[in-house]
């Protein structure tokens, strides 16, 4: 994914640019970047739903030009938002490089929202258009630069067995960053409102979004972990079909195991598991594996503490949960302190 396939490969630009600059002993100055937009204030389609939880992440990654991996820390950010009330649930995923930290101010990011109501689901997504396939592509993109922004956008409505999808490539006067999410979401909604949607039938049993499918499998592993080791092992191989735009995918849980809580991990991260997933595109046959680590009990149950993804053979990306966790009001609190917000996965 599509969400992950969309969002994470852009970290390659920051990593490769950094590897090249270290040999020269110079780093270009990046313009100041404003603080992140608070999730509770973002004008997303699900803004009428109360924020239950907000969790933020730090992005790192590694590249392998030849035989050895080269790593770079703190080049980007991630954010997951849970919303919900009265039978409605929404997930928001924001991932990208931070132009203020990434070498040469590299700017690659994307945002996906899934807003599910009893009447149907809306999926809104936007990302920078660069999709580097090789290290050579990454270096060329980093050297060329671009003061204007170019983004792919999608607005899909899934209801009554039909996915109605509008897509568009949007250009902006300046290269909007991950901190400009609210601005870009407004532009995307306005632009796509005039694009005629294309209809695609959705077979019975197919879930209306990727994030919801991940949450469903995670919920299953949490229940299984509480039931015992045998129940957890039986979760392996479970698959959920979902639609994204006009295409069908299968999300498979290829492996899941209990792990030991790492030193320095939040005390709320109790009974953690490591789960391996694979996205399988039905049309092309392409496969995209990724790993999550998360607690199955306590205040962080169902919250990914580690996200790992390898979109290319030469690239690995990792997002680690920040030490603090955001409250429903958007302010950071200690991850080990009592929580009043409800985790929808618990």
Where are the regions a protein language model picked out?
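An internal, short helix-loop-strand segment that often contains or flanks glycine-aspartate motifs
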Residues: 163-165, 171-181, 185
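Secondary-structure boundary elements
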Residues: 117-118, 175, 184, 194
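Bacterial N-terminal signal peptides
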Residues: 9-19
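Bacterial N-terminal signal peptides that target proteins for export
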Residues: 1-10
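Signal peptide processing junction and immediate N-terminal pro/mature segment
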Residues: 18-33
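Acidic, serine/threonine-rich low-complexity disordered tracts
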Residues: 30-170, 219-346
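Short, aromatic- and cysteine-enriched interfacial helices/patches
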Residues: 6, 24, 66-70, 211, ...
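Hydrophobic, aromatic-enriched interface-forming segments
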Residues: 183-236
């Amino acid at each position: 994914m599509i969400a992950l396939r969309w969002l994470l490969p852009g970290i390659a630009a920051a990593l490769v640019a950094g590897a090249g600059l270290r040999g020269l002993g110079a780093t270009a100055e990046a313009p100041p970047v404003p603080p992140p937009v608070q999730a509770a204030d973002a004008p997303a389609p699900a803004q009428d739903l109360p924020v239950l939880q907000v969790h933020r992440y730090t992005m790192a990654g590694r590249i392998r030009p030849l035989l050895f991996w080269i790593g770079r820390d703190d080049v980007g950010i991630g954010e997951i938002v849970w919303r919900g009330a009265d039978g409605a649930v929404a997930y928001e995923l924001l991932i990208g490089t931070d132009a203020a930290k990434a070498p040469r101010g590299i700017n690659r990011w994307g945002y996906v929202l899934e807003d599910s109501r009893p009447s149907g689901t809306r999926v809104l997504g936007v990302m920078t258009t660069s999709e580097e396939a090789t290290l050579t592509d990454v270096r060329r993109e980093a050297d060329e630069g671009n003061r204007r922004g170019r983004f792919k956008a999608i607005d899909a409505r899934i209801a009554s067995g039909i996915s109605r999808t509008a897509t568009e490539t949007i250009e902006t006067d300046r290269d909007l960053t991950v901190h400009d999410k609210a601005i870009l979401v407004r532009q995307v909604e306005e632009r796509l409102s005039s694009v005629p949607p294309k209809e695609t039938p959705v077979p019975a049993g197919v879930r209306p979004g990727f994030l919801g499918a991940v949450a469903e499998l995670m919920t299953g592993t949490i229940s299984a972990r509480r039931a015992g080791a045998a129940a957890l092992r039986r979760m392996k191989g479970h698959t959920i079909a979902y639609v994204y735009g006009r295409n069908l995918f299968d999300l498979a849980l290829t492996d899941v195991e209990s792990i030991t809580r790492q030193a320095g991990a939040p005390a709320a991260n109790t009974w953690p598991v490591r789960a391996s997933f694979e996205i399988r595109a039905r049309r092309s046959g392409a496969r995209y594996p990724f790993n999550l680590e998360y607690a199955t009990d306590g205040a962080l149950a169902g919250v990914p503490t580690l996200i790992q993804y390898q979109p290319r053979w030469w690239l690995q990306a990792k997002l680690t949960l920040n030490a603090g966790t955001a409250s429903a009001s958007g302010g950071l609190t200690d991850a080990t302190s009592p929580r009043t917000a409800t985790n929808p996965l618990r």
